[in-house]
Amino acid sequence: MREGALGVGSSLIYTPANFAETDELIALVGAATEYNGRYISHLRSEANKLEEAVLELIKISSITGAPAEIYHLKAAGKKNWYKLENVFNLIETAKASGLRISANMYTYAAAATGLDATMPPWSQEGGHDEWVKRLKSKKNRDLLSEEMLNADSDWENFFMQAGPEGILLTGFKNPDLKKYIGKTLSEVSNLRGTSPQITAMDLVIEDNSRFDAVFFLMSEENVLKQIKKPWISFGSDAGAIANEGVFIEKGAHPRAYGNFARVLGKYSRDEKAISLTEAIRRMTSLPASNAGIYDRGQLKKDYYADIVVFDPEEIADRATFEKPHQYAVGVEHVFVNGIQVLNHGKHTGALPGMVVRGPGWSGWDTE
């Protein structure tokens, strides 16, 4: 924390973080609060045990006193869509009691992660090499196939939440597998003549990676419900990538290019789901304050001049799941720390970015 961290983050559906128990997280977050740190979590479940996972986050916040945020709030899997209203009630009750609970979201009904999310944690214990080794064992493959088909598993089973037809393969390292980019796991399974479970295992082995995929898990109705909640900020859950060079050799989730323009265009201007003023607040000052960053996110004296100039009548996302590598349109100028980096839609070549440090930063004096 003295070196500038904003707080403690956890990704509790992934190994090795999913082996962490609540008491361990409380101890870590408690230490961060000594430096005004926050807690942010990719919940232990976004599906079958969503409500329990939200209660765990609320408990951690209650015991430690730390503000807590949920990474990309969602109810994953059709049978869990109804749970979103329950989650709203849990969070809003906690907020009313004085806890500082918030969440962020991206405005698409599909998630993106690796194929490790389709297999149980025990198969991945010990790291990647051990995982691949287990996938080559006939005994393990039979057991994994059975567990992957269990819709009521006690782990976050994206294989069943999305279904093979709802898992879009978007990125491989192995050149021989790139022909499958843009196809669903179901389609590749049919092409290869193996079950979807075995196909997933074989692709992990052949690519020697967790490789990327898009999972169609959520409902558009729930996306709209979340957009209307004033305590949910907007975030892409993606890196900033370019539509050129090595970046276009693999697929992507369209949120990497279009999330913010989609809020301003589709949901604010076109569908009137949120006012323009509120949309801007929830992608600027709200996330900045939630993260404990108090000199950014507003056009205000003594704040860093991070400014976007866009045409509200033209701004729109262009990226799709079929053709994700497309920039949004309608953004004319961008200033970062007062330096122009986009001029009439063209990059100036300037690189004025700065490291943003948390409230506990001691100027590197960590003795």
Describe the role of every protein-language-model region.
Residues I26-G37, S41:
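Alpha-helix-loop-beta-strand connector modules within alpha/beta enzyme cores
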Residues G7-G9, I40, P67-E69, S102, ...:
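Structured core elements
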Residues M1-A17, L25, V29, K59-S62, ...:
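Active-site neighborhoods of metal-dependent hydrolases
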Residues S137, K225-I232, S236-D237, V308-M354:
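C-terminal cap of metal-dependent C-N hydrolases
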Residues G4, H42, N104, G193, ...:
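Divalent metal-coordination and catalytic microenvironments
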Residues V356-E367:
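Short, solvent-exposed cationic patches
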Residues R210-V223, E271-I280, A288-H325:
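Acidic, glycine-enriched loop/beta-strand segments at the rims
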Residues A17-A20, S45-E51, K78-W81:
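Acidic-and-aromatic substrate-binding clefts and catalytic sites of carbohydrate-active enzymes
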